Amino acid sequence: MFMSRMLEEIRQQPEALERTFASEMRRAEKFKRFVEKRRPKLIVLVARGTSDNAALFGRYLLEITTGIPVSLAAPSIETLYKARVNYSGALVVAVSQSGESTDTNLILEHARERGALTLGITNESGSSLARLAEHVLLVRAGKERSVAATKTYTGQLLLFYLLAYALGGRIRPDDLARIPEAVRGALALEDEIDALSERYRFMRYAVVVGRGLNYSNAFEFALKLMETCYVVAERFSSADFLHGPIALVEPSFPVFAFAPPGVTWESIGGTLDKLRSLKAEIVAISDPGNREIEARATRTIRLKSKLKEVLTPIPYIVPAQMFAACLAAKKGLDPDQPRTLKKVTLTL
């Protein structure tokens, strides 16, 4: 098997998550004490690329566990249209692997000037973002050399759990401490996933579906297929997919689905039933206890750990990351250096 940097960094995730949890739990506790005196009525998240997918997860997690409304910022409203958004009383959270995203940092700077409480989530402690934000949570992933972000994405997700905890959300730190071991279990599926990827060597298009807390993973998996494998990959909520896009599906059309246990299963299962009737080729990522999936999916990637739905997003993205890395190798592509891409992208 070709050993890309991307695959190396995927394998580093359990230790990176353990470092992040051990170090940033203290910062989260400190922020928890601070925010008790200044509880925000609104949270605004700003990010680009993979970090934007992490922010989408943050929106679901924060609203579900804290009840505080969350908005995803559209940077062009300020950077291009020059609107002066009133951030007074809000918590504005900027998410950036490098901490050097121009538009993300500009929004954070404006927000702080206009009365917002600001927090940065980044992998770089010496970055512009870390200097601009009043409070910082650091991804302790170490240097990420592959252009395709993997270990920093899961680190960002973990920090959103810590942020939810700090804001009084229904999050138990003891539960979070189980996530790295669940990721180790997912990594043990590498040979199985490498063999599976061979079947899709000539895949040119695909759809990825998820819902709820794993909806962001559908975006992230699709992004990895696009940037490392050059597959045209669309991503949808399992509910939204039925409102038009399902017309794309014909026999053998490839669909990848995140199918965790919990409140989203009925919706996802219903969508898979419909896809099965259309003879789609369905690959589902699910848990070891879901026996209903066998009748719905063409192939199933089963994680080794049975987790509550709220804890599934980090371990569930790992098989998808490995699949993209393995498929890129099967296609003769270098996932570490996708054409026309750089590690840090500057936009306004």
Which residue stretches match the model-derived regions?
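Short, local alpha-helical segments
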Residues: 253, 300-310
